Each structure stands twice: as structure tokens, then as C-alpha cells.
Amino acid sequence: MAMKLYGDEMSACVARVLLCLHEKNTEFELVPVNLFACHHKLPSFLSMNPFGKVPALQDDDLTLFESRAITAYIAEKHRDKGTDLTRHEDPKEAAIVKLWSEVEAHHFNPAISAVIHQLIVVPLQGESPNAAIVEENLENLGKILDVYEERLGKTKYLAGDTYTLADLHHVPYTYYFMKTIHAGLINDRPNVKAWWEDLCSRPAFLKVSPGLTVAPTTN
């Protein structure tokens, strides 16, 4: 039986899992969850994720939530299919993948997601973005990208010379970020820009990106 992924493909966190599924050439069923109708707050969904956020994944008797936990599971279960996203055959390489995945989760994502929330989500809720929050997180993001610029001057991808979860996890929020007037934070750093353009050229991304349809209503 194919895995069932519950969510809306416009969600960055759902897209993160979709990218992984496509990279691993894994059969799955996407079960739509209407976020605008708050279907992620219904009891049927809360039984899968008590925090009421997409995505959730069901694989036989296993239910998972949190996108990075889901991608780790998919990458491990299907380690011999598709792209090797974890470098599991070499403990040192695998450790570097985990290291840069932690950087994404604890440094990059908090900054970029805060910007996206203010510029895309808040206006959709009929409110005005908080300029101070945007500015503070753009400053933090710039410092993080300076570290990336140096790193990507040494390796093609964050965890080495092959594409892994450490790169994949960045893609959806960065895609939305590049739709804003602040895309220069990426484009003005040659190594980061080249890395991003490489990520955008992957077949899995080309399958997922049409679903990322939310656009900024303010800059």
C-alpha cells in the first residue's frame, strides 16, 4: 500500500516531503487538506497530528508528523532507491548531512520562515506585516547566508559534493523567498546563487514547484 501524505501542496512543509518522495521515486498518495477551510484543525486530522499542522504521513500502521522527521523516515526506508539523501554508507558523510540539516532547522529556517510569514501569510489573514520582524530576520538571514557562501565555495552542496536532505530541506521556503524583493540576499552571493540554481534544476523540484502557488501580496 502506498504511503499517504496529508496536506496542501502549497505548504512549504508539505512541499519538503513531496520533494523527498520524488527524489526517492516512491509511490504515494497526496490526500488534500484544505488549509483555508481549517481542515487541519478537524478531529480527523488532529488524530494524526495533535498540533494541527500539515503535513502528516501514514504508512500502514505508522503515523508521522513534522516534515523533517517524515523526510528522514522516507530516506531511510527507501535508502536503496532514487537519490541517496543521507549518505548512509559512510558514517562521517552521514554525520555531515545531519549537521547541515540541523543548521537548516535551527538557524536558516527560523529566519527565512519568519520573513515569509510576514510577507505572505500575514497579508492573507488581512493584516499588515510587521516591518521590524522582517528587518530583524533579514539581518539574521544575511549572516547565515554569509556562512553558506563560504561553505559553498568549498563544496558543491552543503554536506559535500552530492545533493542530500541538508539541501532539500531548504528548497520550499527559499522558493517563496525568491518571489519577494529581498531575493538579492541569495542572488548577491555567487556561491549561494549557483547552489540555488542547481537545486531549482532538479526533476523533483520541477514536479513540486507548480504547487507552490502562494505569492507575496506585499514586499
From Swiss-Prot:
One of its GO terms (biological process) is toxin catabolic process. GO terms for molecular function: glutathione transferase activity. Glutathione binds at S11, A12, H40, K41, K53, V54, E66, S67. Pfam families: GST_C, GST_N. Its EC number is 2.5.1.18. Residues 2-82 form the GST N-terminal domain. Residues 90-217 form the GST C-terminal domain. It is found in: Cytoplasm, Cytosol. PROSITE patterns: GST_CTER (PS50405), GST_NTER (PS50404). It comes from the Eukaryota. It catalyses: RX + glutathione = an S-substituted glutathione + a halide anion + H(+). Keywords: Cytoplasm, Detoxification, Transferase. One of its GO terms (cellular component) is cytosol. Its main location: cytoplasm. May be involved in the conjugation of reduced glutathione to a wide number of exogenous and endogenous hydrophobic electrophiles and have a detoxification role against certain herbicides. PANTHER family: GLUTATHIONE S-TRANSFERASE F13, GLUTATHIONE S-TRANSFERASE RHO. Belongs to the GST superfamily. Phi family. This is Glutathione S-transferase F13.
